[in-house]
């Protein structure tokens, strides 16, 4: 999910470098305003990046975790000062800190 056309073009180019055209889909819309229960049942990877302060990341993770399949991986990029609560049904696979940024990877428990 992305609503910036320049970023969509970069994402498409990067995805084509690692998979075939029919193996990925980039949704041209805002994740928050999407129809989660419909879209996420077929998605294998979700990556959430800035602007983090614009949304309540805890609520976003809760909504995602109740609408994805067991094999979906969620990547979340936050600032080190951001305070998020990880839903109990998400298992932390990996956490990396890069300067002022933290990247998390989750899967359903």
Question: Predicted segment positions?
Answer:
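Class I S-adenosyl-L-methionine-dependent methyltransferase catalytic core
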Residues: 1-109
């Amino acid at each position: 999910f992305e609503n910036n056309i320049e970023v969509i073009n970069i994402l498409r180019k990067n995805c084509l470098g690692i998979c075939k055209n029919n193996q990925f889909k980039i949704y041209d819309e805002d994740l928050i305003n999407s129809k989660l229960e419909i879209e996420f049942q077929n998605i294998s990877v979700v990556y959430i990046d800035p602007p983090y302060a614009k949304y309540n990341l805890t609520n976003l993770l809760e909504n995602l975790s109740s609408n994805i399949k067991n094999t979906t991986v969620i990547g979340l990029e936050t600032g080190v000062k951001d305070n998020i609560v990880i839903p109990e049904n998400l298992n932390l696979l990996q956490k990396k800190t890069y300067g002022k940024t933290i990247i998390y990877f989750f899967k359903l428990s």
